[in-house]
Curated annotation (Swiss-Prot):
Gene, per the UniProt record: mnmE
Main location, first listed in the record: cytoplasm
Protein name: tRNA modification GTPase MnmE
Organism whose genome encodes this protein: Latilactobacillus sakei subsp. sakei (strain 23K)
Lineage, broadest ranks: Bacteria, Bacillati, Bacillota, Bacilli, Lactobacillales
Keywords carried by this UniProt record: Cytoplasm, GTP-binding, Hydrolase, Magnesium, Metal-binding, Nucleotide-binding, Potassium, tRNA processing
Described function: Exhibits a very high intrinsic GTPase hydrolysis rate. Involved in the addition of a carboxymethylaminomethyl (cmnm) group at the wobble position (U34) of certain tRNAs, forming tRNA-cmnm(5)s(2)U34.
């Protein structure tokens, strides 16, 4: 990967969300950044100001000398910038007209509209960050919980980079030793070379395995946990959704069948980002609209990572309750016995024959009784108490998981090849493949098409 790139043109983009707001930021990056901003800026001589300073002034239209906006201009000179290029950031008043007018002026004097993710891509190509750090930028932007934010910040600081580079160094050292032993066989025996390869393959495989064990938790932090709230009509599903959200998103009445569709909301439960789905009550109905809602509810159960199955403790179990218990047996689930504020009519002995005791939480959504226990159970079920852990090195996306699996497969080939008595130079190929796959994670050996695809997923101006 190059450590510096100088052939880029100068790019610009609005880095803040569109629409009305207190402040908008327009960003420039490239060799001509200072020259371009000087054409449209009236204030201090920016050639003479110190780097990493903010300067008051006005953006003007040079053709008419009309003031476009009152601004603060940040000047950041290469190489100590995010892109390792000269960077200018214009803080102007929020809004669509002024912000876009400034953008158009910059483009009219030589800047090009940046592609999505191009600022971060330049940071990567100029050696400022690697691919794991680039991905963590997007993870940080999209983080829905403090835990997800902390994992992203640690990866941006290089926690995963450091770990992967150490693994690659372990492999590189053994490959170098094998090369020496192959070139100078008089100083080595086949047994010694294969022993070195085997020990290193098993060591690196173990460390990759430890990383892969974090994949599910990392995926949950990054994408959210698809959680379906299910149950027959009027057992308290929508009340539970509203309680977790702390706002009234679902209609709550004592009329069965009020929720006729699937409602989705994100909520942070003790560091676990839940993508909550409040489903229509599952029951037999002749209403065409309700039937559609029921079918969508069944589909939501199939797709869900976690099921919150709500039962009404103030009524005996029904056929529909039993069907839902059976339908969710193979899913991660929590059985919520709601309405504990009312006299119990549910046969708990029968329930114990249908579900495990550790799946059951008793609640009254109306009085908030048991909701804290429910939240604790969700955190325990998926993070096993690690939500307070200081260790934040996690695999957070499918690309990283896939490459680690491929690297591990190459190590399996090394181990099986040695066991089968294969020549060292053939076994060495699989070890090199592992080294390459780990390099793709950080971008040291990633193909150009992958890099282009990855950065195209970023937002404009980042």
């Amino acid at each position: 990967m190059p450590t510096t790139v100088t052939e880029f043109d100068t790019i610009t983009a609005i880095s803040t969300p569109p629409g009305e707001g207190a402040i908008s930021i327009v960003r420039l990056s490239g060799d001509d950044s200072l020259a371009i901003i000087k054409r449209v800026y009236r204030g201090k001589d920016l050639d003479k100001v110190a780097s990493h300073t903010i300067n008051y002034g006005h953006i003007i239209d040079p053709k008419t000398d009309a003031v476009v906006d009152e601004v603060m201009v940040s000047v950041m000179r290469a190489p100590k910038t995010f892109t390792r290029e000269d960077v200018i950031e214009i803080n102007c008043h929020g809004g669509i007209v002024a912000t876009n007018r400034i953008l158009q002026l910059l483009m009219s004097y030589g800047a090009r509209m940046a592609e999505p993710g191009e600022f971060t891509k330049r940071a990567f190509l100029n050696g400022r960050i690697d691919l794991t750090q680039a991905e963590s930028v997007m993870d940080l932007i999209r983080a829905k919980t403090d835990r997800a934010m902390q994992v992203a910040v640690d990866q941006l600081d290089g926690s995963l980079t450091h770990l992967i580079k150490n693994l690659r160094q372990e492999i590189l050292e053994v490959l170098a030793q094998v090369e020496v032993n192959i070139d100078y066989p008089e100083y080595d025996t086949d047994e010694m070379t294969t022993r070195i390869l085997l020990e290193k393959a098993e060591l690196v495989k173990g460390r990759i395995g430890e990383l892969l064990q974090t994949a599910q938790q990392g995926k949950v932090l990054r994408e959210g946990l698809a959680t379906a709230i299910v149950g027959r009509p009027n057992v308290g599903k929508s009340s539970l959704l509203n309680h977790l959200l702390h706002e009234d998103k679902a209609i709550v009445t004592d009329v069965a069948g009020t929720t006729r569709d699937v409602l989705e909301e994100y909520v942070n439960v003790r560091g676990v980002p839940l993508k909550l789905v409040d489903t229509a009550g599952i029951h037999d109905t002749e209403d065409k609209v309700e039937k559609i809602g029921v079918e969508r509810s069944r589909a939501a159960i199939t797709k869900a990572d976690l099921i919150l199955l709500v039962l009404n403790q103030s009524e005996p179990l029904t056929i529909e309750d039993r069907e839902l218990i059976t339908a969710t047996t193979d899913k991660k689930r929590i059985i919520i016995l709601n309405k504990t504020d009312l006299p119990n009519q549910l046969d708990l002995d029968e329930l114990q024959t249908l579900v495990r005791a550790d799946e059951v939480i008793q609640t009254s959504i109306l009085t908030s009784e048991g909701v804290t226990d429910l939240e604790a159970q969700i955190a325990k079920l998926f993070f096993g108490g690690i939500e307070n852990s200081q260790s934040t090195v996690m695999i957070t996306n499918a690309r990283q998981i896939g490459l680690l699996n491929q690297a591990q497969q190459s190590l399996d080939e090394v181990i099986s090849g040695i066991a089968a008595g294969m020549p060292v130079d053939l076994v060495q190929i699989d070890m090199t493949n592992c080294w390459d796959k780990l390099g793709e994670i950080t971008g040291d050996s990633a193909p150009d098409e992958l890099i282009t695809e990855l950065f195209s997923q970023f937002c404009l101006g980042k």
